[in-house]
Amino acid sequence: MQVRIFVAVALSSALLAACGGSSNSSRAVPVNPATNNNGSPATGVITARFDPTNGVLPFPTNLLLSGTRDLTLNIPVVDPNNFGDPKVALNALDGFSTVSPMTTSFSVAPKVSTLIAGQTVRVFEVTLTGTGGGVTGIVRELQATADFVVAPTSSDSSGRTLAIVPTKPLKQLTSYMVVLTSGITDAAGNDVTPDQTYFLTKRTTALCVGGVSQEPLLPNATACALEPLRQLTGSQEAAAGAAGIAKDKIVVSWVATTQAITPVLQALQNRTAQSAPPATVIAPTGLTLGSLGVGLPPVADIYIGSLEVPYYLGVPTQANPTAALTGFWRAAPGAYVPPFAGALDPTSTFVTFANPFPVVTTAQKVPMVLTIPNASSGRTKPAAGWPIVIYQHGITRDRSDAFAIATTMAAQGYAVVAIDIPLHGITNPANPLFVGNTPLAGLGVRERTFNMDLVNNSTGAAGPDGIIDTSGNAFINLSSLLTSRDNIRQAETDLSTLTRAIPTMRYSGPADFDGSRIGFV
């Protein structure tokens, strides 16, 4: 991926063209023809592209953290409030993906056989001076095949883009350094060389001292703008040198730090565990599994109920009927946890590892279905209560799918409980379990679809058709990537809330469910 970024590297094309050789070499002294590593004369030029001024960078790279005030990415964008723009959405993240490929490009297609993981393409787990800072040391080297593979990307028909693909997820909140060497060649055997900007940052002495350029061909402003980048490159090449990579063989290097995966959900789970059990309601339906008309034996009674969950997403209103399609988790402004409190942007509301608690928008009463083994199952309730399985339906399905496993669970003496994930639910008003057909509606319980009617169910076109949109229709939302992410996060926190509620849920007595025996399917 190429991302346009301004890192104050305002190099003119004419100036760069003049910097083709060492800045310490006399331009009047003839030089020998360029040769490759194997001694053969160079017959062409292949460069590892690195031109920040024109947005040509490896991706991901910590250069995109430059100027961050809240530890999130800081990609230049036209409108920072347009979260439909994927780059704006990326700016809400506190790092990069743990599973997506890393990419970088060349001026011409490299010879595929010279792209060798662990040899010409090296990847290291490293430590940094701080967010987006220089490399201070190597923790370990990632291993070819076991940790990553390399190949030209299928999306670039020219063959000029290299993908570095993790074969298992990288660690969260961890920095990785990539180093490419001149062992990579083009089809004619010419060694890859550094791009002009990277070549300048390989310099071992300062480009700028006291505001004055130390490179005769660079104006003061340009040299001083390049100096921070030179220091980053220097720290990377020093670390690579400690791993046995010769400095003069390095053609490009960069560092990327992965995002937080568990801190936000763990923080919410801890808060849920320390809070009072959420409110629940359970009521009999008078139905058994045998009443469903699908051939199931009548071995479990069907109950309905509700669970009150803290909701962190948008809720449709008459004034804003599409709120569920655009809202995403927001933290309280500047509500950072130690040690970040007081040190970062006090206005930021992005949910990150530093500010992990989203603000509750509403308390939603969501519908539940439960199945309880009855006398026909041959099971009796243990003194500690029924062991219970939480059933999680798939995307575009609903809570009633739990009935498919209820027979088997009842035979083993297990109750089953299920709730819908966000924007899912029963959408057929003729279904007896549709919330509107039950007493739950009078208690403020709603289907989690909010009964939205925003698309034509037959054609998929935007606009209502008088029919409730299908379950999960808006769950995967490519027009608002942060909403899609947080729909999944909300589903996970809802399960934590349900787990917290189970020991106190009641349908007949003081100990109906055994909180020490909760399973998940």
Regions found by a protein language model. Give the residues of each.
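Alpha/beta-hydrolase fold nucleophile elbow
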Residues: A511-V521
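Cap/lid segment of the alpha/beta-hydrolase catalytic domain
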Residues: L325, A331-Q364, K381-A501
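Bacterial N-terminal signal peptides that target proteins for export
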Residues: M1-V7
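C-terminal motif of bacterial Sec signal peptides marking the signal peptidase cleavage site
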Residues: L15-A18
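Acidic, low-complexity Ser/Thr/Gly/Pro-rich repeat segments typical of extracellular/periplasmic
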Residues: G21-T322
